[in-house]
């Protein structure tokens, strides 16, 4: 019975997602979960007293290690897995849908979700363009698209031909830097950046993900681009061919652009919509439900009308335009949100442009280009009563949230897979023990004799192995798109900054009423609440491992 109350409390903490802070320190020596200590009783969470002078410090440290190991094993119930719902909507800001009167949407990867089968087609077409039009070596044709290589949100240092993952504080995550298809050793990465992992602000990507020498790959279409870039670099390095990094980067990005400009991607999708377009019936259900509840809808996309029309007919039906109050195609986002000079032009049923001046935006009509300032003037849709959904954090959401006060929703298809991984027992146990071990390392570093340092080095090695295990569960090369080992990624930082809500697909809206209020959970700062497993039982003591931390005052 001694540990039953404590274990029950810890289980409740875990099942509640770790919300809430530590118990207030008590002057009583008893453990709140275990009752008064009896003769010889030992709460598994209560720290052993500091060893006496001359005691075997190594044995003391390993005893602490085993205590923590048992605690983690006992307090992590099976039901803690599968807590997160992949179909849920997650909130960065509090937002009530009852306040939203107008819903706006991007098209690609928002209204229309595409199958991963599209990526090999883009890769192969751009690879062949490089060979046939840019005269790159024929040997590059041996490379095929590898869907397991890259993840979204990576940065590419053009001058160094380095593809890497950067955290929210501009630090390269060591072990995630690749030149071509080969990992770059950590010490070489540090040397490349002047003895540090930090990327200075002036080199980093700017507001729209582009910097003077470093680009961030933010949209889903960039996955085949990163793969092709890495394959071409790999070929040149493997064959000892000299190349200019800037020219190579530009040629690859131009080849990828040609796939879009020439309409190849549009042709593939139009020829087999059943293969490439996913969840079309769910898109129809979302739009119909919103209209049935009196919401106004609009569409702003960079795609051409003929392509959008065929896709919407496939998903929604021939009368799809009657669902939308305004439809804008070839909008040229993100310039649409900042450039006041481009006027709207009306398209007729055949896709021909009209020359008359646009003084109002009519339901059922199609408009091309334009700009947000005229859009706001003509519709009077302003501020928090507008909620716009898109997949590109920069091109779709950044300006709308920061400059115009719209509410924004990010569509992140990768979220579904990542949540399923987080829900696995392997991930949960690995991460929890990793956090507990980190806490032990932090507290036990006060012991600096030779034997203790050897124990701590063993723990450090185990911690690094655990980090690599959890990273590889998501992607062997780069890990999760949302986290480095312990910090949010640069991608996550932008996701939180530019979106009120984020979800795996638009269909997640079907799980909530149209007047639902989303409440973000209070995220504790480092100084506010010690919530990890190694500190769960701080109610048992005034200060965790007080004897070991006596040097801190």
Curated annotation (Swiss-Prot):
NCBIfam families: HAD-IG-Ncltidse. GO terms for molecular function: 5'-nucleotidase activity; metal ion binding. It comes from the Eukaryota. It comes from Rattus norvegicus (Rat). Mg(2+) binds at residues 106, 108, 391. The keyword Transcription regulation does not apply. It is found in: Cytoplasm. This is 5'-nucleotidase domain-containing protein 2. Its EC number is 3.1.3.-. The gene is Nt5dc2. PANTHER family: 5'-NUCLEOTIDASE DOMAIN-CONTAINING (PTHR12103), 5'-NUCLEOTIDASE DOMAIN-CONTAINING PROTEIN 2 (PTHR12103:SF14). Expressed in eye iridocorneal angle.
């Amino acid at each position: 019975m001694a540990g039953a109350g404590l274990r029950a409390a810890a289980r409740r903490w875990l099942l509640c997602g770790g919300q809430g802070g530590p118990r207030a320190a008590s002057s009583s020596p008893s453990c709140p979960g275990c009752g008064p200590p009896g003769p010889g009783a030992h709460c598994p969470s209560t720290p052993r007293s500091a060893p006496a002078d001359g005691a075997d410090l190594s044995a003391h440290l390993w005893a602490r290690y085993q205590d923590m190991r048992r605690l983690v094993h006992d307090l992590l119930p099976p039901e803690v897995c599968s807590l997160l719902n992949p179909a849920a909507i997650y909130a960065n800001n509090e937002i009530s849908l009852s306040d939203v009167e107008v819903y706006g949407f991007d098209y690609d990867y928002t209204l229309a979700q595409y199958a991963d089968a599209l990526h090999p087609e883009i890769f192969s077409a751009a690879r062949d363009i490089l060979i046939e039009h840019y005269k790159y070596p024929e040997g590059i044709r041996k490379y095929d698209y590898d869907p397991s290589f890259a993840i979204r949100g990576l940065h590419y240092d053009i001058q160094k031909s380095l593809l890497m993952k950067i955290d929210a504080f501009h630090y390269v995550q060591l072990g995630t830097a690749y030149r071509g298809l080969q990992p770059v050793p950590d010490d070489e990465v540090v040397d490349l950046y002047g003895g540090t992992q930090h990327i200075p602000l002036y080199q980093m990507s700017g507001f729209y993900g582009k910097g003077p020498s470093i680009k961030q790959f933010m949209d889903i279409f960039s996955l085949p681009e990163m793969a092709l870039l890495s394959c071409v670099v790999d070929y040149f390095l493997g064959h000892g061919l000299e190349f200019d990094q800037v020219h190579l980067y530009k040629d690859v990005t131009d080849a990828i652009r040609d796939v879009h400009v020439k309409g190849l991607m549009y042709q593939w999708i139009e020829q087999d919509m059943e293969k490439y377009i996913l969840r079309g019936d769910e898109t129809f259900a979302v739009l119909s439900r919103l209209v049935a509840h009196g919401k106004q809808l609009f569409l702003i996309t960079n795609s051409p009308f003929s392509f959008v029309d065929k896709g919407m007919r496939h998903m929604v039906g021939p009368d799809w335009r009657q669902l939308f109050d305004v439809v804008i195609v070839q909008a040229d986002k993100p310039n649409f949100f900042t450039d006041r000079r481009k006027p709207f032009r009306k398209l007729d049923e055949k896709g021909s442009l009209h020359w008359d001046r646009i003084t109002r935006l009519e339901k059922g009509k199609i408009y091309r280009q334009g700009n947000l300032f005229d859009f706001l003037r003509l519709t009077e849709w302003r501020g928090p009563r507008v909620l716009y959904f898109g997949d590109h954090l920069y091109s779709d959401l950044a300006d709308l949230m920061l400059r115009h006060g719209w509410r924004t929703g990010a569509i992140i298809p990768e979220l579904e897979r990542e949540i399923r991984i987080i829900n696995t027992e392997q991930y949960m146990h690995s991460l929890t023990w990793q956090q507990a071990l980190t806490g032990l390392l932090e507290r036990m570093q006060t012991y600096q004799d030779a034997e203790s340092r050897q124990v701590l080095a063993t723990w450090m090695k185990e911690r690094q192995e655990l980090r690599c295990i959890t990273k590889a569960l998501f992607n062997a090369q780069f890990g999760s798109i949302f986290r480095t080992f312990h910090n949010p990624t640069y991608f996550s930082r932008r996701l939180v900054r530019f979106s009120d809500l984020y979800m795996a697909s638009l269909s997640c809206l079907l799980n909530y009423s149209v007047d639902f209020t989303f409440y973000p959970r209070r995220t504790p700062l480092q100084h506010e609440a010690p919530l990890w497993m190694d500190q769960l039982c701080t109610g048992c003591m005034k200060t965790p491992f007080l004897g070991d931390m006596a040097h801190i005052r």
